[in-house]
């Protein structure tokens, strides 16, 4: 069994080992700095793949583009599977990898949204099974911390200029018009777009109500979830001029918040809708500052709604998105591949 080692790869490896499956992990990590280190790492990966693919019974790729690039090295009769995360198979990203995906014995998708998008495209496609990733951040049995008073918002995402879809700008515009009230926004994550966002916060007069925490380790991230009472991440799902898409393939931060007993504010379209249910576990809104501000005002006016929706989010997360369920789903999916 082979797959690319990423965060999901570690969860998959644990699930497979728990079910008694022998696993070999291959990845493309660098072997030194710069282009030379990257090239050496890729060359070693390809050599290991060429050797190992002739000694395994099944190959699982965690990236459609990677599968396409290595297919010439694979034995023709080697059954292969692929995991679909989201944007890498939406819109103009799909045609270059479509043939490789059609040659797979089976596909797994991190959300029903991504599965539906793929099946809406001309096929035929292999069977596509939805398997939601688990929230590895929280040790099993961790009890949720009490909710803080007021409105304590948290956003967890990279601050990359190339990924301005996570909703930071929407939140700044919404908060600028929220008015008085007991609220604060913590922004976790770092990247080259941070200076621009900080300047926007200052220009909107929100400097004393917004904290940029930068990149944090897991302990600090758990504390951030415990200090908030609403995960605010209205990620935009939209098509770029070149035909590529932005949006959440699943959105692990929504699940991490739910396990912590925190409700979420999200947009209506994207993989996060598998988890966030409007009026039950959070708010699903249109991608406008007006809609985001309206949801925030509702949360401020009715603090009990944060507790109710947070408790419902935790219950749903533990029942339908837990690690045991993930392990069982992976085992059942692989067993069905023959």
What function would you assign to each model-found segment?
Residues 277-290, 298-304:
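Conserved acidic donor-binding segment of nucleotide-sugar-dependent glycosyltransferases
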Residues 60-67:
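Short His-centered aromatic/hydrophobic patch
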Residues 103-141:
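Donor nucleotide-sugar binding/catalytic pocket of nucleotide-sugar-dependent glycosyltransferases
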Residues 195-222, 230:
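Nucleotide-activated donor-binding/catalytic signature segment of Leloir-type glycosyltransferases, i.e.
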Residues 254-259, 263-266:
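Short hydrophobic beta-strand element within catalytic cores of glycosyltransferases
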Residues 226-247, 262:
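Acidic donor-binding loop of glycosyltransferase active sites
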Residues 145-166, 172-175:
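Conserved donor-binding/catalytic core segment of Leloir-type glycosyltransferases
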Residues 209, 298, 305-320, 326-332:
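A short, well-ordered alpha-helix in the C-terminal region of glycosyltransferases
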């Amino acid at each position: 069994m082979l797959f690319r080692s990423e965060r999901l790869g570690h969860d998959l490896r644990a699930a497979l080992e728990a079910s008694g499956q022998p696993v070999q992990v291959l990845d493309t990590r660098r072997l030194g700095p710069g282009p030379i280190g990257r090239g050496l790492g890729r060359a070693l990966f390809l050599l290991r793949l060429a050797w190992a693919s002739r000694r395994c019974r099944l190959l699982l790729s965690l990236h459609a583009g990677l599968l396409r690039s290595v297919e010439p090295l694979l034995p023709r009769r080697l059954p292969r599977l692929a995991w679909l995360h989201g944007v890498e198979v939406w819109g103009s990203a799909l045609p270059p990898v479509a043939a490789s995906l059609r040659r797979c014995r089976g596909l797994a998708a991190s959300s029903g949204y991504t599965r539906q998008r793929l099946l809406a495209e001309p096929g035929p496609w292999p069977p596509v099974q939805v398997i939601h990733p688990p929230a590895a951040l929280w040790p099993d049995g961790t009890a949720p911390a009490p909710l803080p008073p007021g409105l304590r918002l948290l956003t967890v995402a990279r601050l990359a200029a190339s990924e301005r879809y996570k909703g930071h700008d929407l939140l700044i515009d919404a908060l600028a018009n929220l008015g008085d009230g007991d609220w604060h926004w913590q922004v976790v994550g770092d990247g080259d777009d941070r200076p621009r966002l900080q300047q926007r916060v200052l220009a909107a007069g929100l400097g004393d109500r917004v904290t940029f925490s930068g990149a944090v380790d897991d302990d600090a991230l758990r504390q951030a979830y415990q200090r908030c009472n609403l995960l605010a991440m209205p990620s935009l799902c939209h098509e770029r001029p070149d035909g590529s898409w932005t949006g959440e393939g699943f959105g692990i931060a929504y699940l991490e918040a739910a396990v912590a007993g925190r409700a979420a504010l999200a947009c209506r379209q994207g993989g996060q809708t598998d988890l966030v249910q409007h009026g039950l576990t959070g708010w699903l809104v249109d991608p406008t500052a007006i809609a985001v501000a309206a949801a925030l005002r509702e949360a401020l006016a009715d603090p009990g709604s944060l507790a109710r929706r947070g408790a419902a989010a935790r219950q749903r997360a533990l029942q339908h998105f837990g690690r045991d369920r993930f392990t069982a789903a992976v085992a059942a999916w692989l067993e069905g591949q023959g």
